[in-house]
Structure formats: structure tokens, C-alpha cells
Amino acid sequence: MDTGTFEVHNNVPGQDPVLLPVVGEGVDTDAQRDVFKQRNKPLVDILFVVDDSGSMSGDQQKLASNFKTFITWASNLNVDFHIGVISTDVTTCSGHPCRSGRPPGCLHGSIKYITPSTPNLNAVFQTNAIVGTSGSAVEKGLEAAYKALSPPMTTDPKCNLGFYRPDASLSMVFISDENDQSPNPIHFYVNFFRSLKGSRNADLIRASGIGPSKITNGTCSGSCRYFEVSKQMKGIYQEIRSTNWKQTMTNIASASFGYRSQFFLSRKAAAASLSVKVNGVVVIEDPRNGWQYDPVTNSISFSKGQLPPPGATIQVAYKAVCLP
């Protein structure tokens, strides 16, 4: 094992060079076998970001009344979940849900988030989801999620401490009848959300939306920020005014809950040499009913019908490409 340090200099006055540790190991063979383990149960954190402006009362009620459809998926898959709700209001406000100085991005409700052991969890979620209609008419759902998943919210015992788990999947669900008006461009928020799990864990994070955009043949017209974020982060998007809420909650649950499907290789692989086994059984290379290799991310992804089951051992054998 060899170690070293990169020293990165810059032209910012008063800024010292940045030192980056480097660790590497030489090998004398191109034969490689990577072994992965599927979790015994999925860990998922779900953050609902709900518009609390004056026109949202009916949609909040629909969200609350259809939560049972959503949570049934989690129960059937034996998911270890955290589910919390915040509003799109990131301004200082005195009304519901910002009563008592609730900071922007702070989880709503006396029970901040629900888990499988929360008593009467359906009733608790229904209470938390009714975030009120006296919030700002300048809806900033992406900014609210950014604040909710950043210090000081993540370290505040009165707000979000304990909700976010670094080793869990993260799914965000934005619900609004107006376009997002957050101050930063979409790529700022997408990059931040992805950074929470790292580039090698892209399948651990999703964003979905029930929003104002009109979608025709997969193309958005009108207010498209929530649609674009959902598209870039491989989630579900539905128009809020044409939504069959029960079906939409089922679709979002199917995207949010589940086992890991993507596994990153330790060395750059020669694609033709790849062989994949799950619990000792060979799985064929087939994007529809097996696995496929992505040379850009150097990862193996399983199709929906071939996901490794709970506790499974995944073995990937291949010849590594010698890099200059």
C-alpha cells in the first residue's frame, strides 16, 4: 500500500494550498473479483416537501388521505424508514407551520419523523402533512430541502437531528401547484443532493414531484423546475391537477422503496470479460431481464425483475483494464 499527497495551489489571497491524501496499491494480475452484499432490509429516508401557500388545502388533504397506499409498500418490503415533512416556505413567518419560530427546513409536527415503530403512524403523517395555507406565496421547495438536509437543521435536536442517515437511501417528494422559485439554478440543488451519497452511490437518492408542469409525450411546458429535478434524479413526476393520487403515491413508493440495484466495481473492467453471480447462480447480461454494465460509471446495474434479494451475495468477476 502506497500513500502520498496532492498539493493544490490557488490564486486566492490568503488561501493556503489544499492537501489531498492519496492511497494506492499495485497489483500484478488483471484478474479481479468484487464481492458485494445486499442489505437484509432497505433503509430509506423520505422527505416530503409540501407547498403551504393559500391554494394548497385540498392537495394537502389528498396527500394525507392517500398516505396509506404509500406506506403499504414500505410494510410489504420490510423497509426501515424515516418519513418527515417540511414546507416550501423558507421565509420568516409567524403563522402555521412556522408558529413558534419554526426555522426554514425544520421538520413539521410534534413527532418530527415517523419510523416503523411509531404508534398510529398513519394518523401522525396525516397531521404532519397538513402544513397549513398561510405560508409564503413564493414557494421555494428545492431551497427548503437543501436547508433541511444541511447544518444547522441536521444537527438541531428541535428540528431534524436523527432524520437523515448517511447509510440510507434518500427520496424527496416535492408537492406544489406552483413552480419552484428557489434562488439557485437547478444544477446547484441536484449536485448538492447527489453529493450527500457520493458519485458511487447514485442509486441511493431519488427526487419525485407532484407539480404544476404540463407534460406532453415526456416534454415539459410551463413551470418545469420540479419536473427537471425529478427527471435528472430518476424519480416520478405527475401533474398535480390531473393526478390520480392513489396511483401516483403507488408510483412514487415503487421508486422510493426497494433494494440496491447498482454496484460499482473496484477497477476499470474489460466489458467483454464480465461475469456476474448472485448467491452462486450466474445472471445473464440483459438490460431487460438481467444486468448491464455502464462503462462511464464502471458499475453493474440489475433490471427490476432481477434485483438481488435481501442478504444476497453478488460476485462480479472480470479482467481489469490497465490504465496508463
Labelled PLM ranges:
Residues 13-15, 78, 309:
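A cross-taxa feature marking solvent-exposed loop/turn segments within ectodomains of secreted
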Residues 24-296, 318-324:
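Divalent cation-coordinating acidic motifs and surrounding scaffolds
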Residues 295-303:
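Extracellular adhesion/glycan-binding regions together with long Ser/Thr-
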